[in-house]
Amino acid sequence: MYAVVKTGGKQYRVAAGEKLKVEQIPADIGQEITLDQVLSVGEGDQLKVGTPLVAGAVVKATVLAHGRHDKVKIFKMRRRKHYQKHQGHRQNYTEIRIEAITA
């Protein structure tokens, strides 16, 4: 069984037992969280698509860790004007493990 959930403004296809990194969620390590924005649920060749959410569908997950992604370097330059600007960014994430999908 798999589901498509929305969290942090992004959509993820998840299945039970999977680990994934999502946008930072304010929860403690080891805490069980509920992802209730389920867009679709599928099993085998059956697919249930919500309008926009599947009624009664819930994905339960456990928070494993918090961290930061690798640095993304931004470099701006104006040719012939001796203008250069360096900038960096590291995005925070939360690593979760999908425990159960109920639909």
Curated annotation (Swiss-Prot):
Keywords: Ribonucleoprotein, Ribosomal protein, RNA-binding, rRNA-binding. SUPFAM superfamilies: L21p-like. GO terms for molecular function: rRNA binding; structural constituent of ribosome. Coiled coil: none annotated. One of its GO terms (cellular component) is ribosome. It comes from the Bacteria. GO terms for biological process: translation. This protein binds to 23S rRNA in the presence of protein L20. Belongs to the bacterial ribosomal protein bL21 family. Part of the 50S ribosomal subunit. Contacts protein L20. This is Large ribosomal subunit protein bL21. It comes from Bordetella petrii (strain ATCC BAA-461 / DSM 12804 / CCUG 43448). The gene is rplU.
